[in-house]
Amino acid sequence: MNVNSVIYYILFLFASTILAADKTSSSVSPTLVWVTGTDANGKLATTQSTYYQSFMSTYTTAETPSSGSIGLGSISGTVGEIRTYSMTTISQGNGGLSKFNQNGLEMKNLSFVKLIGVSFIAFISFILLI
């Protein structure tokens, strides 16, 4: 095997992975996470584990509150009163995706970008074979 064949094979595997990622539509999503703990000898160890996050089905019907209530259960208070909190948590929703979605782009539909990426890989592979 020459060097060009090896490079072509690696690029082919990379392109296949990109195309395969576009076809999945599962509700279970594996994520690699790093977990730190102690091993059997009591020493600190960090290992990589696969975390699976699954989502339960949602229901189309919802409970309707009885007449005269607003459906908040045991929450009570005065309307219009300013509330104070002893702790405030500020976080950015969706990790880094909020800026991406504000620009009118959707993370779910990147088929065109993947097509461009695969085309680029095919072009480079063709150049290497010449």
From Swiss-Prot:
TM helices/strands, residue ranges: none
GO cellular component, one term: side of membrane
Lipoprotein recorded as keyword: yes
Superkingdom, taxonomy of origin: Eukaryota
UniProt-annotated glycosylation sites, renumbered to this chain: N109
Presence of the UniProt keyword Repeat in the record: no
An individual GO BP term: fungal-type cell wall organization
UniProt topology in membrane: Lipid-anchor; GPI-anchor
Location within or outside the cell: Cell membrane; Secreted, Cell wall
Pfam families for the chain: KRE1
Leader sequence segment: 1-20
Keyword terms, alphabetized: Cell membrane, Cell wall, Cell wall biogenesis/degradation, Glycoprotein, GPI-anchor, Lipoprotein, Membrane, Secreted, Signal
Family per similarity comment: Belongs to the KRE1 family.
Role noted for this protein: Involved in cell wall 1,6-beta-glucan assembly possibly by the addition of linear side chains of 1,6-linked Glc units to a highly branched 1,6- and 1,3-linked glucan backbone.
Protein name: Protein KRE1
Species in which this protein is naturally found: Candida albicans (strain SC5314 / ATCC MYA-2876)
Gene name, Swiss-Prot/TrEMBL: KRE1
